[in-house]
Curated annotation (Swiss-Prot):
Pfam families: CASP_dom (PF04535). It comes from Oryza sativa subsp. japonica (Rice). Residues 73-85, 146-166 are extracellular. This is CASP-like protein 4B3. The keyword Membrane applies. Disulfide bonds: none annotated. Residues 1-27 are annotated as: Disordered. It is a multi-pass membrane protein.
Length: 198
């Protein structure tokens, strides 16, 4: 009777089995960082990848809204300076909050992808933080653009100039950031539901 063990050199190409990759990993005791990140990205659930991309998009548009609104100063005795309008100042403040939040969340997602562990210990706690944070930021962005849009529309009826165009552009960027944050909140809600059910 012959033993029925796995055939030697079965061609598996992973870090734990035979093959060139296994030999390379065994030589120095580690897997190359670039390969490790790519493998973790492929193993991440589609929802987690979608959330990372949506947060990156929200970060980009929040940053654009912040920059455009902060630079919206065109003189004329202060009539065309954003900081003379509380609605625009509020929109700028919310854009700053959105940039800080999405920066922290994207950094956290990249850390999890790179190192294979989350900075928040409990999975359910992390899911609650994701869902609550995305919901709050999406609501704040919507409230900011809802406050600034009527003022811009009223001023554009009297005069359509660079100041009102810049304000409209910043509001549009905030709206796109809201859409991305809202979709990210939906994904976070799905992840939270899965954690609670499982």
């Amino acid at each position: 009777m012959s033993s029925s063990g796995p055939p030697a050199g079965d061609g598996r190409d992973d870090a734990s089995g035979p093959g060139p990759a296994g030999a390379a990993a065994a030589a120095d005791g580690s897997v190359p960082v670039s390969r490790s990140i790519v493998e973790r990205w492929k193993m991440e659930p589609a929802a987690a990848r979608a959330r990372l991309l949506l947060r990156a998009v929200a970060w980009l548009f929040s940053l654009l809204a912040l920059v455009v609104m902060a630079s919206n100063k065109h003189g004329h005795g202060g009539a065309q300076d954003f900081d003379n309008y509380p609605e625009y100042t509020y929109c700028l403040g919310i854009s700053i909050i959105a940039v800080l939040y999405t920066t922290a969340q994207v950094t956290r997602d990249v850390h999890r992808l790179s190192w294979g562990r989350d900075v928040i210990a409990g999975r359910k706690a992390a899911a609650v933080v994701d869902f609550a944070g995305d919901q709050v930021v999406a609501y704040l962005l919507m409230s900011a653009l809802s406050a600034a849009a009527p003022v811009t529309d009223y001023m554009r009826q009297a005069a359509d100039n660079l100041f009102t165009d810049s304000a409209a552009a910043a509001i549009s960027m905030a709206f796109l950031a809201f859409l991305a944050a809202g979709l990210s909140a939906l994904v976070s809600g799905y992840n939270l539901a899965m954690e609670v059910l499982v």
